[in-house]
């Protein structure tokens, strides 16, 4: 009898314990879900309010149209004026350099004109700032032949001053200093006609 009573009490206690346990689990689960939803709702409302305030703060303070356009246009004009100044100065420098090179080319081409009124040679038509045209020396049958150079003055300089320059002649791998009263070399076609074999 006593054993049956104890077994019956144990089963009743276990049943009551299991029912109470599951009821507590269900209650705690629902309470935790409710608390989580409440906390999440509060956080969501705070975030949305802060984002709306930031967005409205960046958009709402608008200046009048006339006052907002004036500083922009003045700064834009100032930047354009600066860029225009630099462009003008660079264009002036380039134009000055191109004019100087054109005058040098005209002087050299007019100084070395062809007496036969033919097309000037490549050396006479282009400007070589660091080249001084020595007279053309041609060896024919082991004899040194130099073409004469005329003393032409530049048309831009209105005086007849002859600037004597030493002329160099090459013969048998040796450098010789010659007189300065020789003419510039003629055009390439006349040289070929003068020396057809070479």
Curated annotation (Swiss-Prot):
Residue ranges, annotated region (Disordered): 58-83, 172-198
Keywords noted in UniProt: Nucleus
TM spans (from-to): none
Motif, Bipartite nuclear localization signal: chain positions: 52-72
Domain of life: Eukaryota
GO cellular component: nucleus
Compositionally biased spans, kind Polar residues: 172-181
Short name of one Pfam family: Myc_target_1
Subcellular location(s) per record: Nucleus
Function summary: May regulate certain MYC target genes, MYC seems to be a direct upstream transcriptional activator.
UniProt-listed PANTHER family: MYC TARGET PROTEIN 1
Family, as annotated: Belongs to the MYCT1 family.
Protein name per Swiss-Prot or TrEMBL: Myc target protein 1 homolog
Gene: myct1
């Amino acid at each position: 009898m006593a054993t049956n009573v104890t077994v019956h009490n144990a089963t009743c206690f276990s049943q009551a314990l299991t029912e109470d346990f599951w009821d507590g689990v269900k209650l705690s689960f629902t309470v935790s879900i409710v608390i989580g939803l409440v906390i999440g709702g509060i956080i969501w409302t705070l975030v949305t309010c802060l984002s709306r305030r930031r967005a409205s703060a960046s958009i709402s303070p608008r200046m009048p149209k006339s006052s907002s356009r004036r500083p922009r246009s003045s700064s834009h004009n100032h930047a354009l004026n600066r860029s225009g100044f630099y462009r003008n100065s660079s264009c002036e420098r380039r134009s000055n350099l191109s004019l100087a090179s054109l005058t040098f080319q005209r002087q050299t081409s007019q100084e070395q004109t062809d007496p036969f009124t033919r097309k000037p040679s490549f050396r006479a038509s282009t400007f070589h700032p660091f080249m001084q045209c020595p007279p053309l020396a041609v060896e024919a049958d082991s004899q040194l032949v130099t073409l004469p150079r005329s003393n032409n003055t530049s048309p831009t300089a209105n005086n007849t001053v002859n600037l004597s320059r030493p002329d160099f002649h090459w013969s048998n791998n040796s450098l010789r200093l010659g007189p300065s009263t020789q003419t510039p070399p003629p055009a390439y076609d006349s040289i070929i006609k003068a020396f057809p074999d070479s």
